[in-house]
Amino acid sequence: MIRIRFGMDVLLVVLLATCLLTPAHGTPLEWDFAVTLRTKIQFMDSSWQTIATAAHEFDELSALTFDESEELIYFNDLKHRNGSIFSLKRDLIAANHVAEQTIARTGNESVGGLAYDPLNMNLFWSDTEQRKIFFAPIHGSVTPKVLVDLSAEGGRPDGVAVDVCRRKLYWTNSNVTHPTVERINLDGSNRTVIINSDIDMPRGIVVDQLSDRLFWIDDLKGVFFSVESCKLDGSDRQVVLKDKHHEPLNLAVTNDAIYWTDRTTRAVWSHPKVPVIKVTTTSKPEEEDSTDSTDFKDPEPVAEDCPLVRVANLSEEARGIVVRTGFYQRLQKDHHCASIVRKVKERVVEQNRKFEIRSMLDQKIKVLEDERCMNGGEYRAATDLCICPTGFKGSRCEIRECHNYCVHGTCQMSELAYPKCYCQPGFTGERCELSVCSGLCLNGGHCRVSKDENEAPSCECPAKFGGARCEQNSTEICSLFCRLLKHEPEMYVPFGCHSICEELAQDNSTNIAVPQYEHLEVCLTPRVWTSSVIIILVVGIVSSLLLVAVIVHGIRRLYKPKRPRIRKTFVVRKQARTNSAGDTPLTNRPLATEQCEITIENCCNMNICETPCFDPKLVEQTLSKSSCKEDKKILIHNMEDDLY
């Protein structure tokens, strides 16, 4: 009987150890990001792959916060009848998540933002309906108390964030008529407005303990939004990015990037923490996660390319977001946070002692648990996790962060517990993976690296090559001078080209391909009679001839003499005198009483000019009796009668 019981004890120890050492499927032992959707909480790793989901029994999740000391997530459900704020923790035996009510519902609350103080174990949240900020301890059924009341002044609290090290609470006032970013001590004293200008509708806010800065989202007028930053006292304000077609709610900050949730695109976006004043560009989305696939329309891109990345596509509307920052590992040496971190760790250690069981079986399990954390890691029985010392990571602290991190250099841990590489001479890059000689020397040149780090690498060129990178072929350059040397023997030739010219002369230059150097084309004979020059010349000559012809014609017209006026006088008489045998009608003038004179100007024969000869008086008499053709006949006939 004793043997059977002892065997069962050993079997039970083995089974429990196996359960503790083997993570169950769907349990986020190593999650880095947690995002609240409308009906669930989604856990993702550092590459934004979904590893688990939880809180499926809720209908309208919104804000959330994370207690890194005890691995607890606190979240809000807007439609739950009994509770307002809940906690989510892992069940070690069932290998799943258990949600418990933390803050009971007292009315029609509408939680906008959540924050947690791990030292005093208090929750802080903003109520957008009552326009107040409340706080309450997570243990016990204490009625929530009001920390800040903005209802009298018309304010609307939205995002909240706790500065654990300096014991202050920051919040955003999203009232469009008077928006602000404010802070107050956790005991309710010394309320201060730190931002009240150039701001439209601030939403989520977060305190970055690593850089001692504030980051918040500003929902600008129209379709624009921005992410801004400042020091904890409101100074050194910077615009990290400005974009459009997003509806961001909450944000989280890591060592080098900012992440925020967007309800419009149902996605999580990221951007470097370095300020970029220019308008950014929305990048194309990555492939959707197999766990949550949905159809979406990518936002309209803007003008410029910028490091704005869509890191995760979600199946539902994205709301709250938290990130694992390594608070207790990164800030152990920070002069503002060292004492707070020490106190929190002491409290956690004290709580862990309550979970120790004094039985022999439990002591054996305790040995297995302690052996789970390697490299000096501290085991947390309540959460079944290892808190690793600086320089190690992994679920059991089994991975050295500097292992194979630097390719050509020495790895050391920085003050913020991140690996940093010190490169060997001739190598550069974040991990010393880039050679300074890579692609530098051409045409077989050899790269030389000086021992002086400030001196640039140089190239040792082979024969017949030169230049800073051995890019100049002296044979090809000298061949140009050799070609000109045949025509001008006295021409100057650079040093070293004479021997090459002799070699080319012996080979008749048949085995050398002479290149075309535009900067040396001045040495060649220029081509004068090109097609464009000929066309321009012909057009110029023709135009000149036409211009001369026009000028000559104009001069001739200007100086041409006028045609003389023809004036003729005809003498008409009734009857010729017969007193002289030699008198004729043309030689004998008629008597004054028997003759008349007709003066015709500018007239001539009808066959020669256009002006006919006629008697104006006779025309007046016969104008009404005959036509124009008959008048001409009469005039000519009368003229013949008078002349002959």
Swiss-Prot record:
A biological process term (GO) from this entry: triglyceride homeostasis
Gene3D superfamilies (UniProt xref): Laminin, TolB, C-terminal domain
Entries under InterPro entries matching the protein: 6-blade_b-propeller_TolB-like (IPR011042), Cueball_EGF_LRP_Nidogen (IPR050778), EGF-like_Ca-bd_dom (IPR001881), EGF-like_dom (IPR000742), LDLR_classB_rpt (IPR000033)
Residue ranges annotated as Extracellular topological domain: 27-531
UniProt GO cellular component terms: plasma membrane
PROSITE patterns, sorted: EGF_1, EGF_2, EGF_3, LDLRB
GO molecular function: calcium ion binding; Wnt receptor activity; Wnt-protein binding
Range of residues in the leader sequence: 1-26
This protein's name: Protein cueball
Cysteine disulfide links: C402-C411, C406-C421, C437-C447, C441-C459, C461-C470
LDL-receptor class B repeats: 121-166, 167-211, 212-257
Pfam family name, one: Ldl_recept_b
Glycosylation sites: N82, N108, N175, N190, N313, N473, N508
Phylogenetic classification of the source organism: Eukaryota, Metazoa, Ecdysozoa, Arthropoda, Hexapoda
The keyword Transmembrane helix is annotated on this UniProt entry: yes
Domain called EGF-like: residue spans: 398-430, 433-471
Membrane topology: Single-pass type I membrane protein
Subcellular compartments: Cell membrane
Annotated TM spans: 532-552
SUPFAM superfamilies membership: EGF/Laminin, YWTD domain
Domain of life: Eukaryota
Family recorded in the similarity comment: Belongs to the cueball family.
Cytoplasmic side: 553-644
Role description: Has a role in spermatogenesis and oogenesis.
